[in-house]
Amino acid sequence: MKCYFVRHGKTQWNLEGRFQGANGDSPLLKESIHDLEKLGDYLQDISFDAVFSSDLKRAKDTCQIIMSRNQHPQTITFEPALREWHLGKLEGNKIATISAIYPHQMQAFRHNLAKFNNSIFEAESVYQTTKRVSSFVKFLKDKPYQNVLLVGHGANFTASIRTLLGYEPAVLRAKGGLDNGSVTSLETEDFEH
């Protein structure tokens, strides 16, 4: 099975440098829509056996734009398990402001999730958010799918993809994150390797 993970397009809050999380949401930027159409063109010949998207509007809109360009129509299933990391009190706040107040926590959030203290912000733990996504992906194991499209979010997908690859929490985001509108593919036969 080949899984195509797509991060939603760039939003107003991405532009403003705000945390969105699982409860904050903002619309896609107009210029992002054009980029997503190009991504849809790039993926247009892939026949997806299943298409799943986070149920948050920015991801739903991204998925619908991509699939509107696909040569093989497929029903989109909106899946709460693919929601962004619940970031609690961080949601809606400017990243620069939080970084000034909690420099060590933001350094940990960006580069060493093992040191991120989610309870300060009433947020999901790294384990909770990655377990949610990796469990959903592993649920697909017994399905007769060859190609699966999953549309979701940057912080969650970055950590979850690397969890699926066997990385420890300390290095899940050590090399940065996923760009808006990017696609990352993982292929597996047994969901163990």
Language model: regions and residue ranges:
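Extreme N-terminal starter segment of soluble prokaryotic enzymes
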Residues: 1-4
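Active-site-proximal alpha-helix that buttresses catalytic centers in soluble enzyme cores
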Residues: 7-71
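Active-site glycine-centered loops adjacent to acidic/histidine catalytic or metal-binding residues
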Residues: 8, 81, 153
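Phosphate-handling substructures
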Residues: 13, 69-132
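Glycine-rich phosphate-binding loop signature in dinucleotide/nucleotide-binding domains
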Residues: 45-47, 140-146
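Short glycine-rich phosphate-binding loop at a beta-alpha junction
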Residues: 48-55, 77, 147-151
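GST superfamily/GST-like fold recognition
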Residues: 154-158
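Domain-level recognition of soluble alpha/beta enzyme cores
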Residues: 167-193
